[in-house]
Amino acid sequence: MQNVMKFHLVIFMLFGSVRLQNPTIERKQCTMSNCFDFSKCSTSKKVYIHPMEKRFEESPQSVIYSKILKHFLESNHYTNDPNEACIFLLGIDTTDRDVRSQNYVKNVNDYIESLDPSVWNNGRNHLIFNFYHGTFPDYDDHNLNFDTGEAMIARASSSENNFIKVFDVSLPLFHENHPYEIKESKSERNDDRIENQRKYLVSFKGKRYVYGIGSGTRNLVHHLHNGDDIVMVTTCKHNNDWQVYQDDRCQRDNDEYDRWEYDELLANSTFCLVPRGRRLGSFRFLETLRSGCVPVVISDSWILPFSETIDWNSAAIVVAERDALSIPELLMSTSRRRVKELRESARNVYDAYLRSIQVISDHVLRIIFKRIDNKIELEDHQ
C-alpha cells in the first residue's frame, strides 16, 4: 500500500508540474456573431492551411490529422491564398493533448506565435481539431495547453461544460484505421438482418477501471450480466500496472471476458452499451453504429457527435449514469417497431455522416457553412 501511495504522489507531482507550466487559459465565450468574420465568406467558402516552418516539421503528426489535412488539401475548398479563405486550419497537430501521448505536440503556442498575426487574427475563422484532452488523473477538458483564441474547436468527447453551441463542433472518436474514403453508397453491413435474428438483447465487452474517473458505470455492469441474452464482460487488463490496482473481482472478470468475442457480440446484439471511459466519448460508439447495433449511451454531459444536425433521439438511447442498472427493464419494454426504427436511423446516420474520414471532415465544414448561409439569409431579409 505504501508503494501505491508513493506512486500516486509521484504522478501527482509530475502532472501537477505540467499544469503549473501550462496554466489554464480561459476561453472567450464566443458566438458566430462576435468571433467570426462573415465578410471572409461572402464570395466563396475556401479553406486555407497554415504552412509549417522548418523548425516545426519534426513535431509529431498523427495518422488521423494527416488524413484530415490531406483531404482538405485535395478538396475543391482548398486555397493556398489566405486572402481568399473563409476557414483556416493549423498545419500543426492539435488532435492529441494528452501529455503522455507520443502524438502530443509541445510547441503549439510557439507555432501560433510564428504565424502572420494578421492571418491568425487571434484565431478568428480558425477551426481547431481535437480528439483527446487532458491527462491522468483528471483528464481536464477545459485546457488544451495552448491558447485557442477565438477559434472554433471541433472536438471529440465534448462536454456540456466546455462546448459552445452553434460555434464549436462535436466530433465522433474514431481509430486511425477508420476508412479514409468509401466509394460504395452503403456501409459494409448485412442490412437485411432484422432485430429478432440477433441472439443478444444487449451486450458490452470492454475494460473497466478499478479507480479514478470513468470507473463508476463500468464497475456496475457486471450486475447486469446473465450470460444468456445480456452479456456484460469487463477486464482489468489495461496499462502495464493493472495488477497493482486489481481488486478481488478482477481475475473472475478476466476469465469471463476471455470467453466472448467482441465482434461476434456486436454483430449479434440488438443493443450495445456505450459507457463513458476516462473521457466522455469512446471508439465503441462508431463501432456500434457500423455493426447495425443500437447504441445505449451512458455518459452524462456528453454532447453527441454532430448533434447540431443529427437527431440522436431517433438513432440511440441515452441513459443517465445513475440509471445504469435499470437498462434491461428499459430495453425489454421497447417495442419491436421502435427497435426497427432505431436501427434504421442508426444505419442511415452512420452512412450519411460517419462512415469515413472524408465524410466526417466534409460534414464539419457543412455545419459551419450552414451557419454562414443562415446568417447571410437573415441579413438579406432585414
UniProtKB/Swiss-Prot annotation:
Protein name, UniProt field: Exostosin-1 homolog
Signal peptide range: 1-20
Keywords, alphabetical: Endoplasmic reticulum, Glycoprotein, Golgi apparatus, Signal
Quaternary structure annotation from Swiss-Prot or TrEMBL: Interacts with rib-2.
Glycosylation site list: N268
Function: Required for the biosynthesis of heparan sulfate by positively regulating N-acetylglucosamine transferase II (GlcNAcT-II) and glucuronyl transferase II (GlcAT-II) activities of glycosyltransferase rib-2. Probably not directly involved in chondroitin sulfate biosynthesis but negatively regulates chondroitin sulfate levels. Maternally required for normal ventral epidermal enclosure and for embryo elongation during the early stages of embryonic development.
GO terms classed as biological process: heparan sulfate proteoglycan biosynthetic process; nematode pharynx development; protein glycosylation
Similarity-based family: Belongs to the glycosyltransferase 47 family.
Cell location: Endoplasmic reticulum; Golgi apparatus
UniProt GO MF annotations: enzyme binding; glycosyltransferase activity
One Pfam family this sequence matches: Exostosin_GT47
Transmembrane regions: none
First-listed, main subcellular location of the protein, grouped into a coarse class: endoplasmic reticulum
GO cellular component, one term: protein-containing complex
Other noteworthy facts: Does not display any N-acetylglucosamine transferase II (GlcNAcT-II) and glucuronyl transferase II (GlcAT-II) activities when expressed alone in vitro.
Observed effect of gene inactivation: RNAi-mediated knockdown results in the failure of hermaphrodite-specific neurons to migrate to their correct position associated with a defect in axonal guidance.
Organism superkingdom: Eukaryota
